[in-house]
């Protein structure tokens, strides 16, 4: 099964090696057929502490890193980050 990949905005970078990413999605209301915005926050691993508040990031599912972290930041503002950048360069 492929790893899930989500795109969202960094809303907190206060933790060491961790960022909080807000992912928004649009869902149609079953009765009124109007699109509603739903959002969820994910704790994602940021090894180099390179992400800042407001950055647009891509996160990828990974094995659990801690109790709440099971996502890894793979790209920041369209540029690969960390292990993803090394794999792409090699």
Curated annotation (Swiss-Prot):
GO MF annotation terms: rRNA binding; structural constituent of ribosome
Signal sequence, renumbered to the chain: none
One cellular-component annotation, GO: cytosolic small ribosomal subunit
Tagged with keyword Transferase: no
Keywords: Ribonucleoprotein, Ribosomal protein, RNA-binding, rRNA-binding
GO BP field: translation
Gene3D superfamilies found in the cross-reference section: Nucleic acid-binding proteins
Entry superkingdom: Bacteria
One Pfam family of this chain: Ribosomal_S17
NCBIfam families in alphabetical order: PRK05610.1, uS17_bact
Subunit record text: Part of the 30S ribosomal subunit.
Protein's job: One of the primary rRNA binding proteins, it binds specifically to the 5'-end of 16S ribosomal RNA.
Record family assignment: Belongs to the universal ribosomal protein uS17 family.
Name of the protein: Small ribosomal subunit protein uS17
GN (gene name): rpsQ
């Amino acid at each position: 099964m492929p790893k899930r990949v989500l795109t969202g905005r960094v809303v907190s970078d206060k933790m060491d090696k961790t960022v909080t990413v807000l992912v928004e999605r649009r869902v149609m209301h079953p009765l009124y057929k109007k699109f509603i915005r739903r959002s969820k926050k994910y704790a994602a691993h940021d090894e180099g502490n390179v992400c800042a508040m407001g950055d647009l990031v891509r996160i990828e599912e990974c094995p659990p890193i801690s109790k709440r972290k099971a996502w890894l930041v793979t790209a920041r503002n369209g540029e690969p980050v960390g292990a993803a950048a090394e794999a792409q360069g090699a």
